[in-house]
Amino acid sequence: MKIPLANLLKKRQQVETAFLQDEIIGIIYLMTEDMVLHGGTAIWRCYSGKRFSEDLDFYSPTFPSLTKHFEKIGSSRGLKVTEVKDTGNVISSTISNGKTSVKLEVNHARKVEGSITTYELADGIGIEILSLTPDQFIEDKIDAYSNRRYVRDLYDIYHLVKSYRIMASTRTNLKQFLQTVQRPVDEPILKSIVYMGLAPTFDRMVDEIRRNIA
């Protein structure tokens, strides 16, 4: 029998955050069906990741017209939406329930066709949402790691390459990526966000990625 996520997380604050993420997901899919979840939380919840992630990141061209409705529904459930900003491409906000908060970012400038994917709720139940494929995530994470060298991005690549069949074109891009990959700027933090098993070292992740794409 599968153990619910809430029982696996290391910290109470992580559990509270996970349940708040689920509540926000529920509100979002009440309003629209075009929201495509991406980022670290999507990999964690949709692709059996073992890395805790705080933020919710979406693609949706329709969200700008729904922000007031989102705030209204959230308020009716005791949630507070603050720090709302629109850069012209991305709407960001912070959603709080009095115990914890989650940052929500919606890219409304980029239209992405999502794939129907099972999202695992904190209580262990699965629901269908739109997200990216493993190959799409890897391409995004290659770009992210190349730009900022955060260990979480390399870990996500490592997890996906180990766990899923990857397209030939993605393997080619990974081989090119590994030729010049540099150490992360924040490697020690991985131990605090990987909540099951050992946190792999940089060398272990690079070796494992290379082995799986050979």
What are these model-derived regions, one by one?
Residues M1-M35, C46-L56, P61-A214:
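Structured mid-to-C-terminal alpha-helical surface segments
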Residues L37-A42:
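Glycine-rich beta-strand-to-loop/alpha-helix junction loops that act as flexible
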